[in-house]
């Protein structure tokens, strides 16, 4: 990165970290432990591996990330929070420096990951094995995957809104297409978390959700509505950024039912098509 661009980036980082501290004063200690690095798209994998080694990231986590990247090779990665026994780092795509709004949204998102990771470590009752995908309770693990992306993006969008930083909002049509894709196609729990955050940010409510779910299977509609209400209640809490094992398990149970009902509906439709063809 050129010197002028690097200086420019450091100024932005300092401003954004200050805004984050104003929203979450307790984050100051966490911010002192995180290093922010940049990598262009062409060198992302190599730079990520180096950062992971410096942070002491567990091999299993590195493999999990590689598998995720392989599944979503056409989806650009703009940032990532990396953690391990030696430290924490945030890796950002150099290209995000082209637009301040995108840069702020991405960095707030990764800082939120770092802050929530720090909060989880402070909580003796939190199932920290979720952080490495090792929770024995499958529902709790599923809930954590949805939650960590939902809360990171929610925090990012909230701060951007409070600080009047312009970000790209999803339209109703885009959100409906996103939801339909999750219902009809293959999705990850992270995708669901991001959808829910974007839906709430666009003043999503029960009525709008019902309109988006028109003509969908009744069981699937009920599953999505339960996830919506669970997250909606969580956001009304004073310390909404903190989660516990009970909440994660409840969320994960809803997600597991959604996946099962999706599969049931797909098999039912396939059977109907076979009957029509015969």
What are these regions (language model features)?
Residues 1-80, 257-277:
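A metal-dependent hydrolase signature that marks the N-terminal structural subdomain at the beginning
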Residues 10, 14, 109, 146-150, ...:
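A structural signal for well-ordered alpha-helical segments within the folded catalytic domains
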Residues 22-31, 121-124, 161-166:
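Surface-exposed helix-capping loop/turn segments at secondary-structure junctions
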Residues 57-107, 111, 117-118:
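Active-site scaffold of zinc-dependent metalloenzymes
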Residues 101-102, 117-150:
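Post-HEXXH active-site segment of zinc metalloproteases
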Residues 114-122, 155-162:
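Active-site catalytic microenvironments for nucleophilic, acid-base chemistry
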Residues 155-182:
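Short helix/loop segments within enzyme catalytic domains
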Residues 173-278:
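Pan-zinc metallopeptidase signature
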């Amino acid at each position: 990165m050129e010197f002028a661009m690097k200086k420019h980036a450091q100024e932005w980082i300092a401003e954004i970290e200050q805004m984050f501290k104003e929203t979450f004063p307790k984050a100051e200690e966490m911010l002192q432990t995180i290093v922010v690095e940049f990598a262009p798209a062409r060198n992302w994998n190599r730079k990520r591996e180096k950062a992971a080694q410096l942070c002491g990231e567990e091999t299993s986590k590195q493999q999990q990330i590689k598998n995720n990247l392989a599944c979503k090779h056409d989806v650009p990665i703009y940032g990532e929070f990396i953690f391990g026994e030696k430290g924490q780092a945030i890796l950002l795509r150099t290209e995000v420096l082209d637009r301040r709004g995108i840069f702020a949204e991405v960095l707030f998102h990764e800082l939120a990951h770092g802050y929530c990771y720090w909060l989880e470590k402070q909580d003796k009752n939190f199932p920290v094995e979720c952080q490495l995908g090792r929770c024995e309770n499958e529902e709790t693990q599923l809930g954590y995957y949805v939650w960590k992306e939902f809360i990171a993006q929610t925090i990012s969008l909230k701060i951007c809104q409070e600080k009047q930083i312009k970000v790209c909002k999803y339209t109703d049509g885009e959100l409906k297409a996103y939801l339909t894709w999750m219902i009809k196609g293959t999705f990850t729990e992270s995708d669901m978390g991001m959808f829910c955050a974007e839906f709430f940010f666009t003043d999503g409510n029960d009525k709008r959700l019902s309109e988006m779910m028109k003509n969908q299977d009744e069981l699937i509609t009920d599953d999505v509505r339960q996830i919506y209400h669970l997250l909606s209640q969580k956001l009304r809490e004073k310390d909404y950024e903190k989660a516990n094992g009970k909440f994660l398990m409840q969320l994960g149970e809803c997600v597991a039912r959604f996946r099962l009902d999706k599969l049931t509906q797909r098999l039912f439709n396939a059977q109907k098509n076979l009957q029509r063809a015969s």
